[in-house]
Amino acid sequence: MERKVHIIPYQVIKQEQQVNEIPRGVEMIQAPAVWNQTRGRGVKVAVLDTGCDADHPDLKARIIGGRNFTDDDEGDPEIFKDYNGHGTHVAGTIAATENENGVVGVAPEADLLIIKVLNKQGSGQYDWIIQGIYYAIEQKVDIISMSLGGPEDVPELHEAVKKAVASQILVMCAAGNEGDGDDRTDELGYPGCYNEVISVGAINFDRHASEFSNSNNEVDLVAPGEDILSTVPGGKYATFSGTSMATPHVAGALALIKQLANASFERDLTEPELYAQLIKRTIPLGNSPKMEGNGLLYLTAVEELSRIFDTQRVAGILSTASLKVK
């Protein structure tokens, strides 16, 4: 199968030698507000991308293994080094360790399994992606994150995705960056357009839909995707933009949600149940569902709605009590 898939095109804004901050995207989705309850501990996230810098100080404690399915390094399966930068950036947004330097990921105690399916040019064969998904299933991961896509609906790829979901794995993918800002025109990319996949669009820090973000009926939600600071090879940091950057926010969030929900329900939730828990934690932004799906990922949405309800309930009780006094 010689047909090609690529990293979702993205823009490099700037690179930095050193930083020490919680990235704005992590803050925007309210991840720090739930870290006292959950940090993603024990949740295994497979990152299907260009590999990863396993020696990056913000990532090395989180990486539990890796596998190479590309033609880089003469196809050596044991070498999953990132020569591109894209995969390392994605991994950092998901689970960069909280330490005294660098950045912090959405789920700073989640485990990362690096599955290299795109080569140094950011390109790969559909076979590599398919093999990577089956490897993730074999390794019993909880979440698969893919910031990649191609124009073709390949049945074998769809079948691999279905098998992952049937194995109770949450599969998410970037919606794509071919958008024109018009929700009346659809831009389709695969595997993001498969119904079984959680398709992630992008917004900016003003909560406006990113013009480049694909619009179609399969978009599930949106997350920050412009000017996203994260890790890059060589122990450095960089700011990228794209739906590729939005997707790992959702992967990290699901690691947080899975740990929290499983503890609350005292059992392992199924893939559909965890998807429902994710969608409960979104807020509408007023765009077409083709642009934003269910809305912006917002991890404290449930608690904030509960507070509003409690305030209204108390106000109602006080109002009733006043009437009785009269």
UniProtKB/Swiss-Prot annotation:
Belongs to the peptidase S8 family. SUPFAM superfamilies: Subtilisin-like. The active site is at D49, H86, S244. The keyword Protease applies. It comes from Paenibacillus polymyxa (Bacillus polymyxa). Pfam families: Peptidase_S8. Keywords: Hydrolase, Protease, Serine protease. The keyword Cell membrane does not apply. Its EC number is 3.4.21.-. PANTHER family: CELL WALL-ASSOCIATED PROTEASE, SUBTILISIN-RELATED. GO terms for biological process: proteolysis. CDD domains: Peptidases_S8_Subtilisin_subset (cd07477). Disulfide bonds: none annotated. Residues 23-303 form the Peptidase S8 domain. This is Intracellular serine protease. One of its GO terms (molecular function) is serine-type endopeptidase activity. Involved in the generation of beta- and alpha-amylases from the large amylase precursor.
